[in-house]
Swiss-Prot record:
Residues 46-117, 131-161, 211-240 are annotated as: Disordered. Keywords: Apoptosis, Coiled coil, Cytoplasm, Cytoplasmic vesicle, Disease variant, Host-virus interaction, Hypogonadotropic hypogonadism, Isopeptide bond, Metal-binding, Phosphoprotein, Repeat, Transferase, Ubl conjugation, Ubl conjugation pathway, Zinc, Zinc-finger. It is found in: Cytoplasm; Cytoplasmic vesicle, Clathrin-coated vesicle. This is E3 ubiquitin-protein ligase RNF216. One of its GO terms (cellular component) is clathrin-coated vesicle. PROSITE patterns: TRIAD. The keyword Metal-binding applies. Zn(2+) 2 binds at C605, C608, C623, C628. A zinc finger (RING-type) spans 515-564, 675-703. GO terms for molecular function: ubiquitin protein ligase activity; zinc ion binding. The modification Phosphoserine is found at S419, S719.
């Protein structure tokens, strides 16, 4: 405020509604000075505290506004607009100027005392005066009527402009949770609170204290001696120049300047607007994010308003509030879907798919520009390899930077492992001559690339470098992918090294812990525990969970300790189990829970096995899977469009193949036992007749009834397979194959007879496989004793009858003066097959008369030459 300005106005805001925070307690009664002498300055405000007013200067119930008569020098009123609006809309003919902040003892007071824009009524309590510093108080009554008229006009116009801006902020104020908060009694002292919004026809109305009833919650009396009570604290900066003009309170218990029977919605909005500037926005955003992750159907903005209005700055408190009030506002614009659903993928994943640049099968060739940049980067990374070899490898790998760099790095790493350790430049150069090449190998699936690459004599000194911003998007993405993967690999190697060192330290100190399952010794970091703190190694838990989930299909993984009845917590399973086993476990668990809760309403699609809930009286099943969408019959599982008003039996009879298939399915179902609790099919391969389902139910395999334990079976001793002579209970150890075969045979005969009756004897076709007669049991024969050879007379066998002409005699070599003749090899004589004589026995030598014409040798070799 300028020094020469004496036309100042002081407004005593006796009842200004504010937040009960500690900062506002120190500032809400601060002085506020209003100057109307200059339009270029922002008007500071001084609030005179009520306990410091003098009783001798008590005035009437009138509001006095002191100003000059000239309209051109009309001062601005209080900045009653919203935080984003600096001044009110002036009447026509008045120039709009940008206000400038003036000096003030406390800048925070100017920022805090800003009623909201939607206020249409200003209530000034009796005793709250607007006066100037230089003029006496008696002159204030002269201009009260004129000031009231202009004040009402300005307030009405400003409230009309800001009415639309406040509608969006009040979206949740009508909710019943906020109504209960608004109606709670609160202690109100020295506050000017905006009244509830009135209709547009009543804009600009000024109400006084005498028009309202008394307070519903009076303020406690101030203490004697000038010490303010807890409801009226001293201002942060005392008033020095106004000490002689302080006004005393007209009543020890002044009432509020507004009625309490209606809602205080503008009140609460003002509180929120002031508190939002003080609250850590990062904490609020984190609370909103975590709460929406747990309650994805909550409406937008509702959680943030709950935080501000109810001061719930704890995640557990917010979750408990939503659980206790399930009728909170919910979203209607979209369907909430599990982000890990295998049916529908999120839009982000669809727009930006995550590509594994190390997978050769998923890569596509890049253009020439990307190839050139990738080659330049690789030549800068591998300066000991020739540019031809680098470009060849890059071309073979479709021009991708990441996979080429990984292949070259692996080849050099393998060369470093195979090369001997050297120290010194001379030895290194000598070894480089001996190991001056690397074997580049890339194998992935059916792709196999090999080449021997030789090192350069000297490293490449000149190579082109690129700024990261100058790279093409494809090359930059691959470079970032490679760096991230290398970082993850290095972290994994460090982690494995840390585990190894940790285990060595445990072993050195003798602190290894024994596993309760395999009795191996492990460090504590490699162990997991059940809810009762029984320790097991991770390998045992993985094998146990794999067998339980994929084998027996257990719903709960209980402790492997024999005497423990606890199970493994979900947090331990998530840390230890692989993703495949964990997902299957969750799938089994969800399936069992849904089947237990809706056993009669759970239906699976016959095409894709997608489960869904369907009312028992609905016959048509529409698969909700977006990749299937087939409509089938719930009973016969046939396509619904093929029914056309036909029953399931008529539809099956209409198509002979389907009819035969349905009969064969009945025959197959005769061998399958279904659980009475969950409906799972069971087939016994071996063991006793007490069957246990994965859901925990027990049944008899013979009579197919629900049982509990072994009391259902016969307990009398008897021979295996023999019926009991004392009771008619089921046997524990029997083979139910015969009973199943009889039932299948009955179903097959009934279907064949029905087919003969409808189609006739000539068109009869066998249904199902032919019945196999059971193999007759052959009595076990004891081993026969070995016969002892005896000299018994042997029967004479008839001679073997030959049906061929006599054998040709071998040619005789003529001898003329003993000169050898070149006649070639002499063919061997024909040898007939031996007679069918049993000679493989253990008796003594038998002299049998054989054919005397048979030769006793096979003759010379066929290619024998003399």
């Amino acid at each position: 405020m300028e020094e020469g300005n004496n036309n100042e106005e002081v407004i005593h805001l006796n009842n200004f509604h504010c937040h009960r925070g500690q900062e506002w307690i120190n500032l809400r009664d601060g002085p506020i000075t209003i100057s109307d002498s200059s339009d270029e300055e922002r008007i500071p405000m001084l609030v005179t505290p009520a306990p410091q007013q003098h009783e001798e200067e008590d005035l009437d119930d009138d509001v006095i506004l002191t100003e000059d008569d000239s309209e051109d020098d009309y001062g601005e009123f209080l900045d009653l607009g919203p935080p984003g609006i600096s001044e009110f809309t002036k009447p026509s003919g008045q120039t709009e100027r940008e206000p400038k902040p003036g000096p003030s003892h406390n800048q925070a007071a100017n920022d805090i005392v800003n009623p909201r824009s939607e206020q249409k009524v200003i209530i000034l309590e009796e005793g709250s005066l607007l006066y100037t510093e230089s003029d006496p108080l008696e002159t204030q009554n002269q201009s009260s009527e004129d000031s009231e008229t202009e004040l009402l006009s300005n307030l009405g116009e400003s409230a009309a402009l800001a009415d639309d801006q406040a509608i969006e902020e009040d979206c949740w104020l009508d909710h019943p949770y906020f109504q209960s908060l608004n109606q709670q009694p609160r202690e109100i002292t020295n506050q000017v609170v905006p009244q509830e919004r009135q209709p547009e026809a009543e804009l600009g109305r000024l109400l006084f204290q005498h028009e309202f009833p008394g307070p519903a919650f009076p303020r406690p009396e101030p203490q004697q001696g000038g010490i303010s009570g807890p409801s009226s604290p001293q201002p942060a900066h005392p008033l020095g120049e106004f000490e002689d003009q302080q006004l005393a309170s007209d009543d020890e218990e002044p009432g509020p300047a507004f009625p309490m029977q209606e809602s205080q919605e503008p009140n609460l909005e003002n509180i929120w607007g002031q508190e939002a500037a003080e609250v850590d926005q990062e904490l609020v955003e984190l609370l909103v994010k975590e709460t929406e992750a747990r309650f994805p159907d909550v409406a937008n903005g509702f959680i943030e308003e709950i935080i501000h209005f109810k001061n719930y700055y704890d995640l557990n408190v917010l979750c408990n509030f939503l659980l206790e009030n399930p009728d909170y506002p919910k979203r209607e614009d979209r369907i909430i879907i599990n982000p890990s659903s295998s049916l529908l993928a999120s839009q982000d994943e669809t727009k930006l798919p995550k590509i594994d640049f190390f997978d050769y099968s998923k890569l596509t060739p890049l253009d020439q520009r990307c190839f050139i940049q990738a080659a330049d980067l690789l030549m800068a990374d591998f300066k000991v390899l020739s540019s031809q070899d680098i470009k060849w490898a890059l071309h073979e790998l479709k021009g991708h930077y990441a996979i080429t760099r990984k292949a070259l790095s692996d080849a050099i790493k393998k060369w470093q492992e195979l090369s001997p350790e050297t120290s010194g430049k001379r030895k290194k150069r000598k070894q480089m001559n001996q190991y001056s090449y690397i074997d580049f190998k890339f194998e992935q699936g059916d792709i196999k690339i090999e080449k021997r690459m030789f090192f350069l004599e000297n490293k490449r000194r000149h190579c082109r470098s690129y700024d990261r911003r100058a790279l093409l998007p494809a090359v930059q993405q691959e470079q970032e992918f490679y760096e991230q993967k290398i970082k993850e690999m290095a972290e994994h190697e460090d982690f494995l090294l840390a585990l190894q060192m940790n285990e060595e330290q445990y072993q050195k100190d003798g602190q290894l812990i024994e596993c309760r399952c395999c009795y191996g010794e492990f460090p504590f970091e490699e162990l997991t525990q059940c809810a009762d703190a029984h320790l097991f190694c991770k390998e045992c838990l993985i094998r146990y969970a794999q067998e339980a989930v994929f084998g027996s299909g257990k719903l709960e993984l209980s402790c492997m300790e024999g005497s423990c009845t606890c199970s493994f917590p979900t947090s331990e399973l998530e840390k230890v189990l692989p993703q495949t086993i964990l997902y299957k476990y969750y799938e089994r668990k969800a399936e069992e829970e849904v089947a237990a809760a809706y056993a009669d309403e759970l239906v699976r699609c016959p095409s894709c096995s997608f489960p869904a809930l369907l009312d028992s009286d609905v016959k048509r099943f529409s698969c909700p899977n977006p990749h299937c969408r087939k409509e089938t019959c719930r009973k016969c599982q046939g396509l619904w469009k093929e029914h056309n008003g036909l029953t399931c039996e008529e539809l099956a009879e209409k198509d002979d193949i389907k009819y035969r298939t349905s009969i064969e399915e009945k025959m197959t179902a005769a061998r399958i036992r279904k659980c009475h609790k969950c409906g799972t099919g069971l087939i016994k391969s071996e063991g006793c007749n007490r069957m246990s389902c994965r859901c925990g139910a027990q049944m008899c395999y013979l009579c197919r009834v629900s049982i509990n334990g072994y009391d259902h079976f016969c307990q009398h001793p008897r021979s295996p397979g023999a019926p009991c002579q004392e009771c008619s209970r089921c046997s524990l150890w029997t083979d139910p194959t015969e009973d199943d075969e009889k039932l299948i045979e009955e179903i097959q005969k009934e279907a064949e007879e029905e087919q003969k009756r409808k189609n006739g004897e000539n068109t009869f076709k066998r249904i199902g496989p032919p019945l196999e007669k059971p193999v007759e049991k052959v009595q076990r024969v004891e081993a026969l004793p070995r016969p002892v050879p005896q000299n018994l007379p042997q029967p004479q066998m008839p001679p073997y009858a030959f049906a061929h002409p006599p054998f040709p005699l071998p040619p005789v070599r003529p001898v003329f003066n003993n000169f050898p003749l070149n006649m070639g090899p002499i063919p061997a004589p024909y040898v007939p097959p031996l007679p069918n004589v049993r000679v493989n026995y253990d008796f003594g030598p038998i002299h049998m008369p054989l054919e005397h014409n048979l030769p006793m040798h096979f003759g010379p070799q066929p290619r024998h030459r003399f």
